[in-house]
């Protein structure tokens, strides 16, 4: 076990997930196969996301560690009174990949539209613009895509991923020809996904070496309900 991370508790009580070295390494191999740029050029990240959340603490920190990259800790964040610090940091550090939640992208896009110095520094080396944690609105996507193309003279990849604490975290990436707002993507390399009827919806279920074996100290009868006979983890997400 590398660490314990708690689920967000947004729909149920938070549960502890034993996150293993295998889960983390499988995730990073998924990412490397999806983003071969990481092998060509060691990634440079500026990141404010908390390490007790799987996006920041497993996904982003792991990208730097696995690929011999660099991660700078951003002491700003996309909230009132804090985002100016992020802007200052981005004028000092040009990331090769920038990862954020949609709220962060909304704030940054507005700043990029107004600040030429920021555009020059931010777009100097960046090859991938990545969001996760929630959906980026179509309007937000289009604004970001427009400012990137205007400044760089070409498209910069805007991508997203679907994941969760229990899978450390990746399950799907927006690869392939269809990349747009609202699209959750295709299964990550090594991840199997099936959709199971659940009422009038479909439940998202996953299987792979990146999936936890079970929650920490959850009763056996409760553990048995989260995995089916084929070994798929039932996420409870539609």
Model-found features: residue ranges?
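Conserved AMP-binding A3 loop
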Residues: 2-29
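Conserved G/P- and acidic residue-centered "switch" motifs that form tight phosphate/ATP-binding loops
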Residues: 9-10, 68, 163, 208, ...
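Structural detector for helix-capping/boundary residues
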Residues: 21-22, 49, 191, 236
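Thr-Gly-centered strand-to-loop micro-motif
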Residues: 48, 74, 131-132, 196, ...
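Short Gly/Pro-enriched turn/cap motifs at secondary-structure boundaries
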Residues: 178-187, 228-230
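Conserved ATP-binding/catalytic segment of the ANL
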Residues: 202-238
């Amino acid at each position: 076990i590398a660490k314990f991370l708690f689920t967000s508790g947004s729909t149920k009580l938070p549960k502890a997930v034993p996150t293993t070295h295998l889960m983390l390494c499988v995730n990073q191999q998924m990412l490397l196969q999806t983003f071969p740029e990481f092998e060509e050029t060691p990634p440079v990240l500026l990141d404010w996301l908390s390490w007790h959340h799987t996006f920041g603490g497993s996904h982003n920190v792991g990208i730097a560690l696995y690929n011999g990259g660099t991660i700078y800790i951003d002491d700003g964040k996309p909230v009132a009174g804090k985002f100016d610090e992020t802007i200052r940091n981005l004028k000092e550090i040009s990331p090769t990949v920038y990862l954020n939640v949609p709220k962060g992208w909304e704030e940054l896009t507005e700043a990029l539209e107004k600040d030429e110095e920021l555009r020059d520094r931010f777009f100097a080396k960046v090859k991938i613009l990545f969001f996760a944690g929630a959906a980026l609105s179509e309007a937000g996507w289009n604004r970001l895509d427009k400012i990137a193309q205007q400044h760089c003279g070409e498209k910069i990849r805007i991508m997203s991923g679907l994941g969760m604490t229990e899978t450390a975290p990746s399950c799907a990436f927006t690869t392939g020809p269809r990349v747009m707002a609202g699209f959750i993507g295709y299964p990550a390399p090594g991840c199997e996904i099936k959709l199971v009827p659940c009422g009038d919806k479909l439940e998202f279920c996953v299987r792979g070496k990146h999936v936890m074996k079970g929650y920490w100290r959850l009763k056996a009868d409760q553990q048995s309900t989260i995995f089916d006979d084929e070994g798929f983890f039932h996420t409870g997400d539609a």
